[in-house]
Amino acid sequence: VGLNGVGIKAVNALSESFEIQSFRDGETKYVRYCRAKIVEERKIEPTDQPNGTQVTFFADKDIFGNYHYIAEYLEAMVKNYVFLNTGLTIFFNDHKYYSKRGLYDLLMENMSGEGLYPIIHLKGEDIEMAMTHGRQYGEEYYSFVNGQHTTQGGTHLSAFREAVAKTIRDFYKKDFEISDIRTSIIGAISIKVQEPVFESQTKTKLGSKDIRPDGPTVRNFIMDFVTRELDNYLHRNPDTAELLLRKIVETEKERKAMSGVQKIARERAKQVSLHNRKLRDCRVHFNSNHERKNESSIFITEGDSASGSITKSRDV
């Protein structure tokens, strides 16, 4: 995944030993290569193994020298594979990786603490989503297309974020601020797209507009699914719906309180400190909310004595 269709060719060419064995419909075929040249090839034989492909390779030491694999990087990839393929088992460094609940397990793996309500996990044909809210600031998403981790998002993630916010607004029949809904959200979305188009060679951002030729758009496909399934879930789980509502209301209160603090700070910043002793600031600013702001005036005097008396006698 992520090598733009040349992955197996590149690995074969850069391996001192590359073995591949395919199992299909009760038959198997085995071929072994050395630096992309066939050194052993067996005839098709009967087998009782399930369908699949086994690949074994050793990187060419003449090219890579005393190489080693970065276990943390491979482990992250392996985990994503099992999260996206429920029931798949992968063994890596004598450790078994397996997931029964797909994206639900992915969120559990990546959350720094418990969610504020149980993870909402929904699956459909060619689509799966999971979401909850945590205690962190900002938004956190994991998006996938055909098993590819789109770290930069794309059309599917944009549609997912829009659909979740719209569904929650409609469910509670309240015109919440979008930011209040999304703050602290942790979500994951995975879809399958025919002939996906990515915006870069690294396949980290989906650019596809449609799910398949002559099919719905990515946006409509995700909007329809989330609107229907998330709304149904919230109706069936009133306790979760109540916790979600409480979270949004608390975020709204925090935002308004913070907005008030910021407003006061801005108003204080406008009250410029005048270092020139010839200039005296007025008591009431014209751009303030004071009831006598329209009485504020500018006085220009010739000398310090006149200025001093006016400054002391004014009340605006």
What function would you assign to each model-found segment?
Residues K9-A13, S17-V316:
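GHKL-family ATPase ATP-binding module
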Residues N4-I8:
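Hydrophobic Leu site in an alpha-helix of the histidine kinase catalytic ATPase core
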